[in-house]
Amino acid sequence: DLWQFGQMILKETGKLPFPYYTYGGCYCGVGGRRGLGTKDDRCCYVHDCCYKKLTGCPKTDDRYSYSWLDLTIVCGEDDPCKELCECDKAIAVCFRENLGTYNKKYRYHLKPCKKADKPC
């Protein structure tokens, strides 16, 4: 669910998901559109694709089980929403790995976005 997702982002990056990642670029936030080309936006594009491939969890706002082990997110092994958890984990880690490239000028990006990336 969004709260769990936000907690993963906060713990991995030290940044609150809002406003840092909610409106950044063209794929981040609700209803991502087309690629801006930033690394954070690429993380969001991959996350959107991950959600499209989910099979075990009916809705992307369902709760899942996870824990932290040695500073690593561990998704619940027997959880029917494990795939959803793995998608959220992947983007939180991607944001952390790209912290040095975060550019707040794209935080409230209102200009038209570039041509869409290849389909998932």
UniProtKB/Swiss-Prot annotation:
Site (Important residue of the cationic membrane-docking site (MDoS)) residue list? K104, R107
- Main subcellular location of this protein, as a coarse class: secreted
One GO MF annotation is:
calcium ion binding
The protein's superkingdom reads: Eukaryota
Q: In which tissues is it expressed?
A: Expressed by the venom gland.
Disulfide cross-links: C26-C113, C28-C44, C43-C94, C49-C120, C50-C87, C57-C81, C75-C85
Swiss-Prot/TrEMBL site (Putative membrane-disrupting site (MDiS)) positions: W3, L10, K15, L16
Q: Tell me where in or outside the cell this protein is found.
A: Secreted
One GO BP annotation is: lipid catabolic process
Annotated Gene Ontology cellular components are: extracellular region
Q: Where is this region: Important for membrane-damaging activities in eukaryotes and bacteria?
A: 104-115
Annotated site (Putative cationic membrane-docking site (MDoS)): R63
User: Keywords of this protein's UniProt record, alphabetized?
Assistant: Blood coagulation cascade inhibiting toxin, Disulfide bond, Hemostasis impairing toxin, Myotoxin, Secreted, Toxin
Residue numbers marked as site, Cationic membrane-docking site (MDoS): K111
Q: Residue numbers for the site described as Hydrophobic membrane-disruption site (MDiS)?
A: L110
Against PANTHER family, the record matches this protein to: BASIC PHOSPHOLIPASE A2 PA-11-LIKE, PHOSPHOLIPASE A2 FAMILY MEMBER
Subunit-structure text: Homodimer; non-covalently linked (probable alternative/compact dimer conformation).
Family, similarity comment: Belongs to the phospholipase A2 family. Group II subfamily. D49 sub-subfamily.
Q: What does this protein do?
A: Snake venom phospholipase A2 (PLA2) that lacks enzymatic activity. Shows high myotoxin activities. Also has anticoagulant activity. A model of myotoxic mechanism has been proposed: an apo Lys49-PLA2 is activated by the entrance of a hydrophobic molecule (e.g. fatty acid) at the hydrophobic channel of the protein leading to a reorientation of a monomer.
- The protein, known as: Basic phospholipase A2 homolog piratoxin-3
Organism of provenance: Bothrops pirajai (Piraja's lancehead)
